[in-house]
Amino acid sequence: MILERIVTDNLPDLERRKMRLPLAKLQELVLDIPYLPIDMAMKLKGRQVRLIAEVKKASPSKGIIRPDFDPVDIAGIYARNGASAISVLTEEHHFMGSLDNLKKIRESGVASKLPLLRKDFIHDPYQVYESRLYGADAILLIVAMLSPERLQELLSLSHKLGMKCLVEVHTRSELEIALESNARIIGLNNRDLHTFKIDLTVTERLRPLIPPECIVVSESGIQTRADISRLEELGVDAVLVGEALTASVDIAAKMRELL
């Protein structure tokens, strides 16, 4: 299964990072960060559907999506053209991302008013702390790869550090776990992470089951304005779009088309 392989492939890298920067030292550095995270939940509420634009170089299903990849330049385009938040893929082996990309975007100031979402396969408290250190305002938590107990632990730690969580589900049973954990930003992933197949009806089936106090984000497979209009009718608050933007010759023009 693709999800399991991605997690396994990244375990040695995580252990090396722990060796280079032990948890106790990482925690000290996080405590010294002078600024508070930007509230992603506040940015995703509104009368119109909000856009989380993703900085994405490659994927397991498509390979390299954007050969001339400049994460800071792309984030700047997103910030200038209506994005409400920016998702930054940091997984290295299958998506060609990096934590350094997240850090560069934060330190560049090109998106200083927008929350940065670290999109990765997070399963260890160490990753939550390092997300904060590298400039994330929010993190992705995938229910399919976490026990309910670990999900709750990571949610609580993230909130303690001031970060919001996009809690991602693909099935009704995963949604029930997310809601039981009191997740407030729910991501409905139209992509099955075990097969990487897309099905936009996932959002259609699961959206009615989510209470009104939650923020609902539809993820994956969103290519056109018609897709977004359909999701808007279903009552989602935001959409997360990556490939359709980074694969475009003119990213700004594609954003104008979608919004």
UniProtKB/Swiss-Prot annotation:
<dbReference type="Pfam" id="PF00218">
    <property type="entry name" value="IGPS"/>
</dbReference>
<keyword id="KW-0456">Lyase</keyword>
<dbReference type="GO" id="GO:0004425">
    <property type="term" value="F:indole-3-glycerol-phosphate synthase activity"/>
</dbReference>
<keyword id="KW-0028">Amino-acid biosynthesis</keyword>
<keyword id="KW-0822">Tryptophan biosynthesis</keyword>
<dbReference type="InterPro" id="IPR013785">
    <property type="entry name" value="Aldolase_TIM"/>
</dbReference>
<dbReference type="InterPro" id="IPR001468">
    <property type="entry name" value="Indole-3-GlycerolPSynthase_CS"/>
</dbReference>
<dbReference type="InterPro" id="IPR045186">
    <property type="entry name" value="Indole-3-glycerol_P_synth"/>
</dbReference>
<dbReference type="InterPro" id="IPR013798">
    <property type="entry name" value="Indole-3-glycerol_P_synth_dom"/>
</dbReference>
<protein>
    <recommendedName>
        <fullName>Indole-3-glycerol phosphate synthase</fullName>
        <ecNumber>4.1.1.48</ecNumber>
    </recommendedName>
</protein>
<keyword id="KW-0210">Decarboxylase</keyword>
<comment type="pathway">
    <text>Amino-acid biosynthesis; L-tryptophan biosynthesis; L-tryptophan from chorismate: step 4/5.</text>
</comment>
<dbReference type="GO" id="GO:0004640">
    <property type="term" value="F:phosphoribosylanthranilate isomerase activity"/>
</dbReference>
<dbReference type="GO" id="GO:0000162">
    <property type="term" value="P:L-tryptophan biosynthetic process"/>
</dbReference>
<dbReference type="InterPro" id="IPR011060">
    <property type="entry name" value="RibuloseP-bd_barrel"/>
</dbReference>
<keyword id="KW-0057">Aromatic amino acid biosynthesis</keyword>
<comment type="similarity">
    <text>Belongs to the TrpC family.</text>
</comment>
